[in-house]
Structures are given as C-alpha cells and as structure tokens.
C-alpha cells in the first residue's frame, strides 16, 4: 500500500527536508508539507531549502505542498516533524482524517502545560491512529550529506516499525526497532537540556574531563528521571539515549548546543535563540523538566543548575562549583545491580 501512495512529511525545517530526501532516495513519492507558501515555492523552483538546509539538493521525488488536508488524506504513512509548540495547532483541524493512519513523530519536545510527549498529544488528537516515534543521534545536515547514521523507530505496533524500517533503511541510514515508545521519546526530549550546558562548557574552554563528566552525569539524571516515570532504563543505553546525548552534547551542528555556545559567549537567551533561527526545544523543556523533577522528588542537579543560569542569574562556573562541593553520591544508581 505504501509503495503506491505518497508518503507525507509534515514540516519543512532541516530535519523534515533531510527525512524527505531519504524517502525519495529510496524511490518513494514524498509530499513535504509546510505552512509558508513562499517557502514551498522556493523549494519547488530552486530544488533547495534555502532557509533551513542551504546547499542540499531537494530530490525530484519531493513535492512541496501547503494543503494539509489533501496531504494527509492521500497518505497512509505520515512523518510529523513539527515544533512542539505548533503540533496541536496543525493537527487538530485534520484530526478526523487521521483515523487508521500511521503517524510517526520525530519532535523531541515536551508540552509545557501537560508534560505530555509529542506522541501522547498525537494519540489524544487521533486516538484511532497508529503511532510511532523516530529518534536517535540524527543531525539533519549529516543525514542530508549521507553520513552513516542509525535511528530507532519505537512503537507497540510491530507492523508500523517494519513499515518505517522498509521505507527509510538505505545505504547510509539504518533503522532499529524498539517496543519502548515512551522511553525512546523521553530520551530524545531530555537530552536537549544537557546539550545547552555542553555548548556553554565548550564556549568557556572547559577541559575534556569536564565535558565527559557533564555528559555522564547527564545520562544518570535522564535515566533516573525516566525510571521514576516508568520507562525502561536500559533504553537509555541505546541510540535514543546515550547515542543521542553524545552527538547533541558534542556537535556544533546541534541546535541546542549552538544556543549554549552563544550563551557562553555572553549573549542573552533571547539573542542566542534569535541567532539560531530555528527552534531549540531544550529551552522549553528545561522549564517544565525542573518543575516536574521537583514535583516527583527526583534528584537532577544539572537541570536545577542550568535553570539557575538561564533564569536565575547564576553563572556556569558557580553551578559547577556547587556540583563539585556537594555531597558525594553513588555513580550508577539508576539500574539495579543485584545479581551482577
């Protein structure tokens, strides 16, 4: 069925464009939906996304479109590549058209008011849809430039996982499957917060030992928090956990890392986000994550420290000093070691 129908990609940003190219390379007809008619026309005529993925050719099998209802009606497989703040606004008006469709979320964010992940919001909007999550260490430009990449498709629906693997798997892109949709999606959302701190540390010239400490303790915090919410902690040792955390916290191509780097150079938060020109989900996630951690009583000193830097006037040096002088804790305390 999918081979005879266009595949829809909702969102014309850098990742949506890179994902559309992957699908087109594998011989699929792709409808790349975006709200901005001028952007759609620019891609249609120039065969490039000049705003978000300049210099990367948009393949002929991709049709930029702006009619959302027609796009979702014509497709059985729909990749949702929208900013978290826009997801409800975009999908709610076409909810009646989504029954039975395969909806795959790629957005790594958390809704502020409800603390819902994106696939949970999609499930609320389209309760009869088949839902999955695509996540992992997937920098859009590297995918577009054919760097060897692996990702995870997570869903309780095995047939959906197999369908996504079939359409995306190629010579430079490998897709693994997981049944832990919640854990995979949570890992993708949480790591954005720590990438901001990693970017700041790099900007301030902190050493490799420091960067390694931040990444490792970030993994401990993420996993501790996820386990408290009922996710499988072992998921965080895979591509969607430590894999995504490493690439996001070490690459200047990461949007959240770029925001942190700009903050380390002395820019205000608003200036750093404006310089980026795209959405950095980590800023929004940080606010809700700190509140949720306090509500649940989960120990997350890096989250509290970054919140103090961004919103309470503290410096990174002050936060790191507080971390270093705090009471010593157990290293790996989020996975039971009984039986080892």
UniProtKB/Swiss-Prot annotation:
Its EC number is 1.1.1.94. The lineage of its organism: Bacteria, Pseudomonadati, Pseudomonadota, Gammaproteobacteria, Pseudomonadales. Keywords: Cytoplasm, Lipid biosynthesis, Lipid metabolism, NAD, NADP, Nucleotide-binding, Oxidoreductase, Phospholipid biosynthesis, Phospholipid metabolism. Catalyzes the reduction of the glycolytic intermediate dihydroxyacetone phosphate (DHAP) to sn-glycerol 3-phosphate (G3P), the key precursor for phospholipid synthesis. PROSITE patterns: NAD_G3PDH. Belongs to the NAD-dependent glycerol-3-phosphate dehydrogenase family. One of its GO terms (molecular function) is NAD binding. It catalyses: sn-glycerol 3-phosphate + NAD(+) = dihydroxyacetone phosphate + NADH + H(+); sn-glycerol 3-phosphate + NADP(+) = dihydroxyacetone phosphate + NADPH + H(+). It holds the Pfam family NAD_Gly3P_dh_C. Pathway: Membrane lipid metabolism; glycerophospholipid metabolism. Its main location: cytoplasm. GO terms for cellular component: cytosol. GO terms for biological process: carbohydrate metabolic process; glycerol-3-phosphate biosynthetic process; glycerol-3-phosphate catabolic process; glycerophospholipid biosynthetic process. InterPro entries: 6-PGluconate_DH-like_C_sf, 6PGD_dom2, G3P_DH_NAD-dep, G3P_DH_NAD-dep_C, G3P_DH_NAD-dep_N, NAD(P)-bd_dom_sf. It is found in: Cytoplasm. Sn-glycerol 3-phosphate binds at residues 108, 136, 191, 244, 254-256. The keyword Nucleotidyltransferase does not apply. NADPH binds at residues 14-15, 35, 108, 140, 255, 279, 281. The active site is at 191 (proton acceptor). This is Glycerol-3-phosphate dehydrogenase [NAD(P)+].
């Amino acid at each position: 069925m999918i081979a005879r129908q266009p595949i829809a990609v909702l969102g014309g940003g850098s990742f949506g464009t890179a994902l559309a190219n992957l699908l087109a390379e594998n011989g699929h007809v792709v409808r790349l939906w975006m709200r901005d008619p001028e952007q759609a026309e620019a891609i249609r005529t120039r065969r490039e996304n000049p705003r978000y993925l300049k210099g990367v050719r948009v393949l002929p099998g991709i049709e930029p479109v702006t009619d959302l209802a027609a796009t979702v009606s014509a497709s059985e497989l729909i990749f949702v590549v929208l900013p978290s703040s826009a997801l409800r606004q975009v999908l709610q008006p076409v909810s009646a058209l989504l029954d039975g469709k395969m909806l795959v979320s790629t957005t790594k964010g958390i809704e502020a008011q409800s603390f819902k992940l994106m696939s949970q919001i999609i499930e609320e909007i389209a309760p009869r849809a088949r839902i999955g999550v695509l996540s992992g260490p997937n920098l859009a430009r590297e995918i577009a430039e054919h760097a060897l990449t692996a990702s995870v498709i997570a869903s309780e629906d095995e047939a959906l996982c197999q369908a996504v693997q079939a359409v995306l798997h190629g010579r430079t892109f490998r897709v693994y499957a997981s049944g832990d949709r919640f854990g995979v999606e949570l890992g993708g959302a949480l790591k954005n917060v720590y990438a901001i701190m990693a970017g700041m540390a790099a900007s301030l010239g902190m050493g490799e030992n420091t960067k390694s400490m931040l990444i490792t303790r970030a993994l401990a915090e993420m996993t501790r928090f996820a386990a408290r919410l009922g996710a499988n902690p072992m998921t965080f040792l895979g591509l969607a956990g430590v894999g995504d955390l490493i690439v996001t916290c070490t690459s200047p191509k990461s949007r959240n890392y770029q925001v942190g780097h700009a903050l380390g150079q002395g820019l205000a938060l608003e200036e750093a986000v404006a310089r980026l020109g795209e959405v950095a989900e980590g800023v929004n996630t940080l606010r809700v994550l700190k509140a949720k951690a306090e509500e649940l009583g989960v120990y997350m000193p890096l989250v509290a420290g970054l919140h103090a830097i961004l919103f309470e006037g503290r410096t990174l040096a002050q936060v790191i000093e507080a971390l270093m002088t705090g009471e010593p804790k157990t290293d790996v305390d989020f996975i039971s070691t009984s039986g080892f």
